[in-house]
Structure formats: C-alpha cells, structure tokens
C-alpha cells in the first residue's frame, strides 16, 4: 500500500512537471531572436505576457545585434526572428532560412545632438545634416557594432554622399556597443548620434541632448518577423512559432503593439501586411 502511495505521488509530480498529455513546459515554449534595441525598449515585456495569457505559450528571448541574430538563426538557435534590417531579412528568406517575412510595425530613427547644435542641423533633412556634421567635424558617435541601427546609419552616410569608412579625425567615434551606451557616449561628449526613437524616449539621463532631425522618410525603421524554415531546421516548433507570428500580425497583436507607450508616447506603430513576403 505504501509503495502504491509512493507511485501515485511520483505520478502526480511527473504530471506537474510535464503537464497534460506528457508535454513539458519547454514543449510549450518558443525561442524568439531579436535585437537589443527591441528588448531594451520594453515592448516585449508588454507583449509577451499578453500572448502567453492568450495561448499558454511562453516565449524565451535572445537579444543580440542584428547580424548576430541572423548568424544564430542560421545555426537553428531560434524558432522566430524579429528584427529591423530589411535587406538582410529579405536575403535571409531568399537563402531559404525562413519561408516568408511579414511587416509587423515601424518606428523611426532620429538624429540626436547637443542643444547648442554646433553643426547647425536642426530642422534639416538627414542628408544635409550629415553633410554639415562631417564638414564641421562636429563630434558624432556611432554604435559601430554591425547592428540594424548601425547599418541604417551607414546607409544614410551613403545617401549623404560621404565615404564614412575613410573619415579622418577624432570627430567620428565608435563605441562598439548598444544604443544606450551610444547615447551615453554622445551625452558625455556633447556629440551627435543616430538613435531609434524608442531608445531615445526610454533614455533618461539626456543632459544637453535633444532631437535635431526627425520626420525624414529616409529615417523609417521597419520591423519584420520570420518563422524559421522547418524544412531546413526540423527542430523548429513550427505550430507554436506560427501561432506567435499570426498573433503579432493579427488585429489583437497589432492593437497590443499600438498600446505600448512610455511617458504617454507611442513607441511602435503597427503596419502588418499579411500578404507580404
């Protein structure tokens, strides 16, 4: 009889550990690979509990630079990828690592600079502003870390007609770190820096920094979501991952994105196109 009670207790413990139908907690979890700026914005802390309450699916987040996100995903380290580096995303799909990408939301980049504005760029378009900064040799902080934001910045220098790779002088300063570190470096050096708006809104110790350029259409920062290709990665949790993708681009998920605010300001703007690829 005692042995039977022990067996029943053991079975109950197994049931608690594995849940219904023998499924472990990990079987109801997916891995989402995303960028550090997305994680630091606080958006996922807002979205993921809503998704878990709706579906019972846990989402484990890996936050890295955009290039590291894709490198890890190519090794099968994620079920779903959420980043903001569209050219790289489209190549990722073309190479067969994901079957499709979907627009999810956007925010924008802003050029941050000292309130004293030594390069006199406030209110200019982004190309004119960057030309003025380079011409003046005004201090500019770059993340220099191969992130999505760094890639966007490099593309903007090209738009401005400046070969930033051969830039001379101490005015162009690499931090090789994330957005918060770059903003802090700009604050300390009284320098210009390109930031996604969400990171700027969340950055508290601004000192003498302020937005000097915004609203240029070339500063759009589009986010895409991709389910890893189960034909290439058999261990991908296809059904659970697809459930997350479907929820993000659904009216409910889009409303949750729109509902995330910091200090009363909306950080991300949903724009899912379910037919996009």
Language model feature labels by segment:
Residues 106-108, 137:
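Residue-level signal for tight coil/turn positions that link beta-strands
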Residues 23, 101-104, 132-133:
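Short, charge-rich binding segments
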Residues 25-58, 62, 67, 71-77, ...:
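Exported/periplasmic ABC-transporter solute-binding proteins
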Residues 1-3:
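N-terminal secretory signal peptides that target proteins for export/translocation
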Residues 19-25:
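Boundary at the C-terminal end of the N-terminal hydrophobic targeting segment
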Residues 111:
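Serine endopeptidase catalytic core focused on the charge-relay Asp
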Residues 8-18:
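Bacterial N-terminal signal peptides
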Residues 80-106:
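Acidic, polar ligand-binding/catalytic clefts
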């Amino acid at each position: 009889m005692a042995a039977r009670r022990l067996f029943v207790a053991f079975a109950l413990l197994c049931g608690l550990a594995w849940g219904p139908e023998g499924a472990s907690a990990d079987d109801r979890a997916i891995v989402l690979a995303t960028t550090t700026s997305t994680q630091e914005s606080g958006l996922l802390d807002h979205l993921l509990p809503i998704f878990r309450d709706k579906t019972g699916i846990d989402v484990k987040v890996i936050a890295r630079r955009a290039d590291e996100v894709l490198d890890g995903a190519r090794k099968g380290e994620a079920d779903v990828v959420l980043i903001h580096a569209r050219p790289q995303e489209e190549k990722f799909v073309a190479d067969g690592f994901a079957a499709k990408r979907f627009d999810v939301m956007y925010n924008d980049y802003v050029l941050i600079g000292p309130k004293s504005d030594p390069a006199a760029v406030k209110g200019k378009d982004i190309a004119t502003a960057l030309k003025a900064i380079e011409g003046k040799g005004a201090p500019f902080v770059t993340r220099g870390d191969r992130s999505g934001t760094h890639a966007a910045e490099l593309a903007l220098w090209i738009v401005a007609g400046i070969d930033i790779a051969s830039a001379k002088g101490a005015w162009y300063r690499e931090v090789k770190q994330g957005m918060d570190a770059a903003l802090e470096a700009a604050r300390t050096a009284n320098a210009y820096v390109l930031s996604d708006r969400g990171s700027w809104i969340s950055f508290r110790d601004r000192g003498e920094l302020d937005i000097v350029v915004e609203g240029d259409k070339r500063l759009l920062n589009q986010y895409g979501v991709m389910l890893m290709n189960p034909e290439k990665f058999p261990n991908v949790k296809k059904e659970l991952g697809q459930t997350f993708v479907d929820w993000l681009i659904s009216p409910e998920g889009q409303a949750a994105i729109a509902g995330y605010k910091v200090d009363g300001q909306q950080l991300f703007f949903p724009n899912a196109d379910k037919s996009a690829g």
